[in-house]
Regions:
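Active-site helical microenvironments for divalent-metal-assisted chemistry
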Residues: 1-187
Length: 187
């Protein structure tokens, strides 16, 4: 899959959808995330994942039809059904892993809270997918313009927890994104 194809699919599946403000076309969010991933040196695959990162959350039925699947009932099933499809190649696994809305562990979220769940997602992400998720968080913070304080606070706590507990090697891009999320410094 190339970036143009990913963008086309995202535009198709988000057509007619709007952000929470009811005015901004939803496609502006994946566009912003893909732009940040590109700006921070993400691979072509990572940019594709950025364009597609919300397709299951926002249009599961359209995604199912587009992919020619009878049903999409779980992340694991989706990955199994899509194995070997050259047109989606390596994008699929990363797309499934980055989605915190697809098949979240509701019991874990209830027991530990959303912040811990997000921190765990960050800790287990590959370097490429960490870049996409951090760009997604930063784009959401920027787009909210202070109107979603609880989400911003949750993101900051999760990123702070991740940066204190994480032992993975962070790239300069990761470090800059973490600083931007924590400090709200323009990036």
């Amino acid at each position: 899959m190339n970036i143009e194809t990913a963008e086309k699919i995202a535009r198709q599946l988000h057509e007619g959808q709007f952000r929470a403000d009811g005015v901004t076309p939803y496609i502006e969010h994946p566009k912003a995330v893909a732009g940040l991933v590109k700006e921070y040196g993400g691979s072509e695959k990572s940019i594709c994942v950025a364009w597609l990162h919300d397709i299951m959350e926002e249009n599961a039925e359209g995604t199912r039809k587009l992919l020619g699947l009878n049903r999409i009932d779980s992340k694991a099933r989706f990955i199994m059904d899509m194995r070997g499809r050259e047109d989606w190649s390596g994008v699929l696994f990363d797309l499934a892993r980055i989605s915190d809305h697809w098949e979240p562990d509701q019991k874990e979220i209830k027991e530990r809270g959303k912040v811990v769940y997000l921190a765990k997602l960050l800790l287990t992400a590959s370097s490429d997918m960490l870049l996409v998720k951090l760009c997604d968080m930063l784009a959401n913070i920027r787009e909210s313009k202070g109107t979603r304080k609880s989400q911003e606070k949750r993101y900051r706590k999760a990123v702070r927890c991740f940066s204190e507990l994480g032992d993975k090697s962070l790239t300069e891009a990761h470090k800059k994104l973490i600083a931007a999320i924590l400090d709200r410094t323009p990036v």
